[in-house]
Amino acid sequence: MKSKKFKILVLPSDRTGVSKFRSVDPHTYLQKMYPDEFWVDIKYDPPYTDDNWWKQYDLVHYHRSIGPDYDASKVVAKKLKKWGIPQVMDLDDYWLPTPDHPAHMMIKNAKVDQKIKDMLMVSQYVTTTTTEFASEISKLNKNVFIYPNAINHEEKQYIPKPTPSPRLRVGWLGGSSHIKDLEILNGVFGRLHRERAGKFQTVLCG
């Protein structure tokens, strides 16, 4: 008799960015590599109140929250625990950005930081990216594990295309939320230009 497949529900927080590397791709490859053992469903709008729908799964994985409705997500998380269905919460960013972050006040006013902490406390397991963040998370949930982003180095954006140059190239990549990080380099490139003019190239992306 053919054994029953282990059914996993994956609930990404968005359709790009972090969800690709920490929710969608890892589980897509899991099913691809072990098709006889795992079945993975990816859902962006879960039916919070349909108990029978949730009960069909053997494990639920979500990033930050089960869905955009944090209160409903917390209720579902407690039900999953009662039903004996393991749940794994993934979190890669601190729940409250620094005051210079564009989204700081929006998150603070909507109490999203507290809602994320509430989800951490009701989840059975948590996965994250670094030992430093894992240490912080462990103050709220001791069952925390560290996993790197699932990057497929065969995707075209990661395939190196070396371009010969006599210059030393320095690259920096960041978005609008990284302005304060960029300020740390204030004066560095001016000094490099004075001391190494024509010997280096700076590329800013973002």
Name the predicted role of every residue range.
Residues 82-86, 141-142:
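A short helix->loop->beta-strand "cap" motif at the edges of active sites that frequently abuts
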Residues 14-29, 150-158, 162-206:
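Conserved catalytic-core segment of nucleotide-activated headgroup transferases in glycan assembly
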Residues 27, 88-116, 154, 165-166:
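Acceptor-binding helix/loop patch of EC 2.4 sugar-transfer enzymes
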Residues 78-82, 106-125:
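Membrane-proximal helix-turn-helix segments that form the acceptor-binding/catalytic region
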Residues 121-158:
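Donor nucleotide-sugar binding/catalytic pocket of nucleotide-sugar-dependent glycosyltransferases
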Residues 1-67:
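N-terminal pre-catalytic "stem/leader" segment of glycosyltransferase-like enzymes
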Residues 58-59, 86, 125:
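Structural motif
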Residues 63-82, 173, 182:
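An aromatic- and histidine-rich active-site surface loop
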